[in-house]
């Protein structure tokens, strides 16, 4: 039996309708061409980034999970405490974010899928975090137009922006590069980073509606702003193998290689053109892709990357 514990009301994390990072679907390639097919059952159907609420199919994901007899699903449950005995996790405590009622989950094996290494950190697992030059958090957004004029309130609390201070949101989409918080604390200051991103989005739309973009956007209106940020770099739990750039580029054939990854080494930095207004806290990024990765084949990730090197029953 598996207890799937999720602190949001929907499944999918960054791939849910709350954040809307689409699944590119580069599967059926490399050494393990079939294993990625498991995600096709519940992957989004987005045609653009960010896609629509309907394209991310939150309800479909939940139906699929609840149909599995061996999964007990606990939505809206936030894990906050871990019990450890002799380097083994014995229990995880989670509280219902709606009622504050706490539940103690015991088990044999535990998987930390928090994205922040939270369970590992609470259990005393070895981990690392890049001190400087980290990637940030994105809050994507979308806007629309109609035949009648739409008003938009002035936003004195937002960032003070003009049209030249941000990339124009083409095709009515503010994409992944609306990213902030590069060297901020991705865990302790997550809400502060999210709020700064909000101020950037609303400052940009204020420029479109009430400042130098007003003549061309009289009929524009916001359709969606991600109120949950999509984080990137955070804690990295140590396994028995640390996969290196050299391993990835050379397609090193580990004896315990078990899954393929087909994305290139993709580093994000503040985009200089748009960092001038707020150099200490930029909000627009650029992506620099490593050219050495063969994305038609990918690279095998060894099993030894997927478990903690010092907590015996933690994945």
What are these regions (language model features)?
Residues 14, 101-109, 113-315:
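Flavin (FAD/FMN)-binding glycine-rich loop and adjacent Rossmann-like elements that form
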Residues 5-83, 136-138:
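Conserved N-terminal/central alpha/beta ligand/cofactor-binding core
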Residues 7-8, 77, 92-97, 113-114, ...:
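Fold-independent oxyanion-binding glycine-rich loops
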Residues 83-104:
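Conserved beta-strand-loop-beta-strand element in the redox core of flavoprotein oxidoreductases
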Residues 2:
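Hydrophobic anchor at the start of a short beta-strand
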Residues 73, 87, 295-297:
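Soluble metallo-hydrolase cores and metallopeptidase-like ectodomains found primarily
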Residues 17-21, 88-89, 142-144:
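Short low-complexity, flexible loop/linker segments enriched in glycine and/or proline
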